[in-house]
Amino acid sequence: GVNTAKLSAIAPVRVDKNGVPFTAMEEQPGDSDFHQFSYMGEHRVLKQLPCWTCYTNKKVHETLKSGLADSPLYNGQIQSTGPRYCPSIETKLVTFPDKDQHPLFLEPEGEDTNEMYLNGFSSSMPMDIQLNALHEIPALRDAKIYRPGYAIEYDYFDPTQLKHSLESKIIKGLFFAGQVNGTTGYEEAGGQGTVAGINAALHCVGDKTFEMNRDESYIGVLIDDLTTKGVDEPYRMFTSRAEYRILLRQDDADARLTEKAYELGIAKRDRYDWWIEKKEAIGRIIEFCANYPIKKDEINPKLEALGTTPLRAGCKLIDLIARPHLNLTNLSEIIPDLKAALETPANRKEEITEAAEIKMKYKGYIERERLIAEKMHRLEDIKIKGRFNYSELHEISTEGRQKLERIDPETLAQASRIPGVSPSDINVMLVLLGR
């Protein structure tokens, strides 16, 4: 059957901004430099609202400690594991008893509401304890709250019982996505929902499934981690979980996913054409830089003015771009032909210039990571599901045999990522497969 277990989540108190003396807090302004994953349409920047910082103190800690016996996290009511990276305020006090203060961040919930999210003050304690503790903070002495912090416990389903399409291995045609798979976070849930929704639709019309590899998207990394390794705590996606981070850049999300989306019918023709125009423009810039000759006598005075080492011999423009202090923008100011090459198409100059420069400046790193990914793809092509009776495969380690039997991986690459399955176990399987 479908295996279930429990995890927990905890939320912070919501404060009414009316009556909060922001002059007693440190302002944290919003971003001023904005990037986007989609370059289509008008680049609209929403009004940035500041956040505010304050700190707990010894009196706050004493008040909270007096209520520990009433905290479900510490009186046995909630025993399951919560998110590692956003512990409750009571957990901070217990884990770090030597700390006299902890930072709190007052964050607006929106432009048209007085409700503010007190990040850092998640709690499962009774409301009166939370309120008394807040009032010991000078900036929140007169604070009123909309809702106290709270903790919940919830069921999740073992994600190792899912295929990479997020279809259940147990019940055909049933797809799982989001918190029920043991993840925490909006983007994590949204990414799974996208993949599960696509595959549910494909399943209904009898088409083959849609899956993403670890070198294609962070969604691919997340789903592979869930289905291969499982979870014993709420799973949060971090860039550090991806071994192919250089291939999963902000500037190349369209390069990785637009054509796949168009083939699936979830991206319209104008988006596809938008990407093709960009791809061709990037190619033209790279070709121009790879073939454009630079004469040292002409360029050296200009390089010295930019604070970089002069050339000892002539080179191609692409070689200059590899230098740390040089980029297409400052080089275009001293090389008129380059400036002209960057102007087409004029309405997309910034995004295309950035993408072309990254591909040239980091070419060696990108190609090296691509080769590593391609080697792993060869293992992805070796299907092993149903080809071994793991309980009788005594040539591999006991732990590896048990893990393989429980997870039943689809491919040899997936098997290699299962904790407890060693490289020697993979080699044994390769030999048995005649590879």
Where are the regions that the model predicts?
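Glycine-rich loop(s) and the adjacent beta-strand/alpha-helix scaffold that form part
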Residues: 1-14, 137-138, 142, 195-203, ...
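Extended, charge-enriched "interface" segments that sit outside catalytic cores
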Residues: 241, 258-427, 431-434
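Glycine-rich phosphate/pyrophosphate-binding beta-alpha loops
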Residues: 179-187, 243-245
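Flexible, glycine/charged-enriched surface loops at secondary-structure junctions
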Residues: 74-81, 140-148, 207-212, 296
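Internal hydrophobic alpha-helix adjacent to the cofactor/substrate pocket in enzyme cavities
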Residues: 189-212
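A glycine-rich dinucleotide-binding beta-alpha-beta segment and adjacent secondary-structure elements
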Residues: 105, 117-181, 211-224, 349-403, ...
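An anion/pyrophosphate-binding glycine-rich loop and adjacent beta-alpha core
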Residues: 1-131, 223, 228-312, 317, ...
